[in-house]
Amino acid sequence: MKTMMGIIFANIYDKNMGELTYLRTMASVPYGGRYRQVDFPLSNMSNSGIRHIGIVTKEKYQSLMNHIGSGQEWDVDLEEGGLQYLNPFAMGHDNGGSDGRYRGKLDALKCAMSFLELSKEDYVVLVDGSVLCAMDYREVLKSHVESGADVTVVVKDGICDGQREVDMAVRLDEMGKVADIACNYAAPQGFYASAGAFIISRELLMEKVQEAVARDRYHLERDLVMHGYHKDLKINAYPFAGVALYNESELE
């Protein structure tokens, strides 16, 4: 049986949200009164049987920690596995900058290398805290394994319109295979937008993170997925059919 662990990136798009994230991370922005945005990826992981989760933080994460606590509400406060906060200072990383904080998702994962090395799961689910949806990662893993791909990207149609820039746009051929990938692109209709969720084997992730950061490449979408697609990685796309809310700007 293939096993999964999860990593949530908590600070995605903080700078785009104005005063909403002045004192908190994007993941801890309130939703529906008592809830926070991080509840969505945490619940998705818990409901998918994932009990080993790391939350990557960058700054202003006290309210996030206060809300999540030990993770008991999501059944991840277990002695084996459980939940771990991966902040840049606790990870002991010095990137030569003014404050030692990571420069991109791959840099953050390089900081968290010991977390990955000490884990036992076969696959890692990497998720942004900015896309709100109900998703079963077991179905994504099934698609990933059956495809024989190195990386699976969860994608959503109806987002790309030629005007709105997305982190990653994916074009599929008539067989549903990935035909093109572009990053930071206002892709036209017909492209799928990344839903901020990826599956990759733990061993391959560690290998590719080390390779990328050693070459000053720090961005997951651009430097691992897109660069890998154009070089040597097989990329699979999993079209998500459910409803998803993309929280990327205070103007939306």
PLM regions and their residue ranges:
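Well-ordered alpha-helical segments embedded in enzymatic catalytic cores
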Residues: 37-41, 107-112, 224
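Short, hinge-like loop/turn segments at secondary-structure boundaries
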Residues: 71-73, 168-175
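Short internal beta-strands
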Residues: 52-58, 154-155
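A structural signal for short hydrophobic beta-strand segments in well-ordered beta-sheet cores
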Residues: 28, 170-172, 237
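Acidic donor-binding segment of Leloir-type glycosyltransferases
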Residues: 62-86
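Catalytic-core segments of class I nucleotidyltransferases/pyrophosphorylases
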Residues: 141, 174-252
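N-terminal nucleotide-binding beta1-loop-alpha1 segment
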Residues: 1-32, 43, 48-50
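Conserved beta-loop-beta/alpha segment of the NTase-like Rossmann-fold superfamily
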Residues: 82-172, 207
